[in-house]
């Protein structure tokens, strides 16, 4: 039986809100000059934001050692709730030694602006190699997620946080839709079943195919591209957003899709990040989540369908969101349409396999992706953006 989004509980039962009230903000600002400060990097800023708006419910702050250890080893919080990615605030030994457990810590963004507060309850050291092997399935420093891990501080700070205020996104204010708002939008549209789609690439024809396959069985599609920190060679968020707008304008039913930004940072943790992405979309009100080929993967670190198999390690009720697993879609030159091996009679040589990586490689060579790869309007926008980048 279908449920309205208002009946879809956030992970852990309640949607978290750690945005300071006006009174709290006034109090924190009055204490600013007296508080020790920690400067956050781009990823920590996005984590702070996602905790505050409820995207990372049930987390109310950065993880303590008990939660951290169990997440790394078992993909569960200390209370047994499924959670697959450590959300931590790491600092150097020197910075950690200057902070007192039990006190407040001022959190600044990379520009030095005061954006949040941490109630410091615990400082603890952790094993980076153990985290790398368990979370990323590799200790290779060339892996982008492992590289970030190895470069961060040796001590984690734990405790509840407050975001001083929810400011508009500088690039995409119209698409900044927090979990409270997305749930309301789903209710207003009367959607009972909503499928979420995570992406950090412009949508190519294979993505479009699996999204529309999913949309045949649910009420709405929540297209939720990630605009937080990504790899240097990933296509810039502003370019990707223009591509999404173009695609939705020409090729999708207007009343069945909502486009919103996901401010989180990529970890490139493959299977574990697939679980994480699903739980985040559950917090936004989704009932289903698309898991395709090599979800959240990078290079050859993960098997093609490892990110689908990991969902089988949990009881369905533990996750509270339904994974929709799709095979690798391709363009079939025999039938002249998108398909998978489940629906196509084609031989391997009649299949044009698509990927964001291939599209990026073609653009760098100055080639326009063919219509089998990308819709013409999207390909033209990508090519225009690449020319601008070369000239800059």
From Swiss-Prot:
GO terms for biological process: hydrogen sulfide biosynthetic process; sulfate assimilation. Pathway: Sulfur metabolism; hydrogen sulfide biosynthesis; sulfite from sulfate: step 1/3. CDD domains: ATPS. It is an enzyme of class 2 (transferase). It catalyses: sulfate + ATP + H(+) = adenosine 5'-phosphosulfate + diphosphate. The keyword ATP-binding applies. It comes from the Bacteria. One of its GO terms (molecular function) is sulfate adenylyltransferase (ATP) activity. InterPro entries: ATP-Sase_PUA-like_dom, PUA-like_sf, Rossmann-like_a/b/a_fold, SO4_adenylyltransferase_pro, Sulfurylase_cat_dom, Sulphate_adenylyltransferase. Keywords: ATP-binding, Nucleotide-binding, Nucleotidyltransferase, Transferase. Its EC number is 2.7.7.4. Belongs to the sulfate adenylyltransferase family. PANTHER family: PTHR43509, SULFATE ADENYLYLTRANSFERASE. This is Sulfate adenylyltransferase.
